[in-house]
Amino acid sequence: MIVVQKQLINSQIKSPQVFLIDHENNNRGLIDTYEALQLAQSVELDLVVVSQSKDTPVAKILNYGKLQYQKKKRQGQSARPTVKEVRFRPNVGAADYNLRIEQALQWLSKGDSVKFAIRLRGRENQYREQAGQMLERIVTDLSQVGKVQSLDKRSLIVQIMPA
């Protein structure tokens, strides 16, 4: 079970005094909570407890909605995978190949790494040289936007990271 610590805002703050940081990041020192609330309301912002300490909490005057939005955005970015994988067969058509290369260009421009893997099954193993040439072609096609992080011709995998 994950315990989410809820931030206290405005009238939820029960402490008689807070250590205040105003909306311009100036340290205001120890101030009564009521007075800090009045300051926050005068600039049409919220009083948010940033750090709950034993003696007096540290409160900051800011836009609480904007703070929540930025926190949610940071969580989304940290959860996003950074390695995208594209799988090929040795006899892929030109249109499919170009489509995958375009996708890889978009991912590399966003900052994600791209891993290309060529899968050989059964009788396709006789096309191993052709698959190796395809890996080289992928590297040359993406050389403008990315650089090779690892190239393994034995297992037919190449990983390209943004340049």
From Swiss-Prot:
UniProt KW Transport keyword: no
Keyword vocabulary terms for this entry: Initiation factor, Protein biosynthesis
One GO BP annotation here?
Answer: ribosome disassembly
| A Pfam family per the record | IF3_C
Molecular-function annotations in GO = ribosome binding; translation initiation factor activity
Q: Which cellular component terms (GO) are annotated to the entry?
A: cytoplasm
Q: Which family does it belong to?
A: Belongs to the IF-3 family.
Q: Which PANTHER family match?
A: TRANSLATION INITIATION FACTOR IF-3 (PTHR10938), TRANSLATION INITIATION FACTOR IF-3, MITOCHONDRIAL (PTHR10938:SF0)
Under NCBIfam families, the record lists: infC
What is the protein name given in its UniProt record? Translation initiation factor IF-3-like
Q: Which organism is it from?
A: Nostoc sp. (strain PCC 7120 / SAG 25.82 / UTEX 2576)
